[in-house]
Amino acid sequence: MKLEIIAIGGYEEVGRNMTAVNVDGEIIILDMGIRLDRVLIHEDTDISKLHSLELIEKGIIPNDTVMKNIEGEVKAIVLSHGHLDHIGAVPKLAHRYNAPIIGTPYTIELVKREILSEKKFDVRNPLIVLNAGESIDLTPNITLEFIRITHSIPDSVLPVLHTPYGSIVYGNDFKFDNFPVVGERPDYRAIKKVGKNGVLCFISETTRINHEGKTPPEIIASGLLKNDLLAADNDKHGIIVTTFSSHIARIKSITDIAEKMGRTPVLLGRSMMRFCGIAQDIGLVKFPEDLRIYGDPSSIEMALKNIVKEGKEKYLIIATGHQGEEGAVLSRMATNKTPYKFEKYDCVVFSADPIPNPMNAAQRYMLESRLKLLGVRIFKGAHVSGHAAKEDHRDMLRWLNPEHIIPSHGDFNLTAEYTKLAEEEGYRLGEDVHLLRNGQCLSFERII
């Protein structure tokens, strides 16, 4: 018997997640993501027009050339959820493998959009929808199970590969939200059942391992937004809320609050249109009937003209640009590149924390500084993370009781912090906790 886990991407950084599991020559790929901060560094780059080798060189997508040295055949590409750091490299890499792409309904719809926008490669891999709670035989020896989990995007799952040698559980990304705004609670029964049946290896995200306690549920963010928006004296002023375009639950909360305020909710931005439009089309979420969505620049321009003409106080704008990204709607508004001109006491609510890297921090600081100079009231803190904190990770380890652990989706500070937690639970670095670099392979050999 030979089972290998190949760390292709996401084992030295946050992002560009990609892992391969080789079971006696039958290979399953888990996720194909991009590294978002590298996209920002190369801000003039249109990824859709570039060759995969250029993107590998820039550190934007995983370097899957390591797969040339792996003996076996790829049988499936399995996606855990729809964030770009997990699916963004599909248009660049999937065509190399004669294998279907498997994901939940929302994830597959997002992948379809990514493939349609690709200008360099012709991606023809079959797309297979698998719902949370369902299983599918990938080969006679490997069964894939999707366990429902919560994260900051709907339809997220824990993919589990059931093999003759034990299960491989892929925990990128998750939180335990017992009060979700959209969707259901995690399937704790299924998680514990997998643990009882025997987990050979658990691959776990580490993004928020350095935060004590447990990550609060999404309903807390909803309450904070109500506090900011309903309690403030802003009846006569413009209100703009900015958050992650993929955070459908958060956007649902904001649009519902707009309705309570008697304001028409307006979504602005291409990514807002993509993520929210798909979620609404497939029935994942029900937004207020008067919701308006504008994606392309000309329609956004026209929408803002109408808002100014009819009165800012009649609308609540939900815009892209919470990280201060140049070219995002909020950044363009703050630099007077749209018909919407900020006035004193207009409100901007940031319902997202800055992504922790220097470039994001600098861009966000510049945006906030510009808004303050214009007399804008700024509200921050109406946010909860979509990632597990330390005690969530401890619970997961106790339920799964894996023989081996591979920390991932983080730099070495984060994976080392996860190792400390694992050692508190009786594991030992180098024995059953394994810190891998991108391109490295961990082999398990045993007799059944």
From Swiss-Prot:
Is Metal-binding one of the keywords?
Answer: yes
**Binding residues for substrate:** H383, V384, S385, G386, H387
Point out the coiled-coil segments of this chain.
Answer: none
Where is this protein localized, as stated in its record? Cytoplasm
Q: Which GO terms describe its biological process?
A: RNA catabolic process
Q: Which Enzyme Commission numbers does its entry carry?
A: 3.1.-.-
Q: Which GO terms describe its cellular component?
A: cytoplasm
Give the activity regulation note.
Inhibited by imidazole.
Q: Which residues bind Zn(2+) 2?
A: D85, H86, D173, H409
Obligatory cofactor(s): Zn(2+)
Pfam family for this entry, one:
RNase_J_b_CASP
Q: Where does Zn(2+) 1 bind?
A: H81, H83, H151, D173
What note does UniProt attach to the cofactor annotation?
Binds 2 Zn(2+) ions per subunit. It is not clear if Zn(2+) or Mg(2+) is physiologically important. Optimal NaCl concentration is 100 mM for nuclease activity on RNA.
Explain how this protein's activity depends on temperature: Optimum temperature is 60 degrees Celsius for nuclease activity on RNA.
What the entry lists under InterPro entries is as follows:
Metallo-B-lactamas, RibonucZ/Hydroxyglut_hydro, RMMBL, RNase_J, RNase_J_2, RNase_J_arc, RNase_J_b_CASP, RNase_J_CS
Query: Which UniProt keywords are listed?
Result: Cytoplasm, Exonuclease, Hydrolase, Metal-binding, Nuclease, RNA-binding, Zinc
Domain of life of the native organism = Archaea
MF annotations from Gene Ontology: 5'-3' RNA exonuclease activity; RNA binding; RNA exonuclease activity; single-stranded DNA 5'-3' DNA exonuclease activity; zinc ion binding
- Describe the protein's quaternary organization and the partners it interacts with: Forms homodimers on heating to 60 degrees Celsius which may be the active form.
Q: Which family does it belong to?
A: Belongs to the metallo-beta-lactamase superfamily. RNA-metabolizing metallo-beta-lactamase-like family. Archaeal RNase J subfamily.
Q: What does this protein do?
A: A 5'-3' exoribonuclease with a strong reference for 5'-monophosphorylated RNA and no endoribonuclease activty. Also has robust 5'-'3 nuclease activity on single-stranded DNA (exodeoxyribonuclease, exoDNase). May be involved in RNA degradation.
- UniProt-recorded name of the protein: Ribonuclease J
Gene (name only): rnj
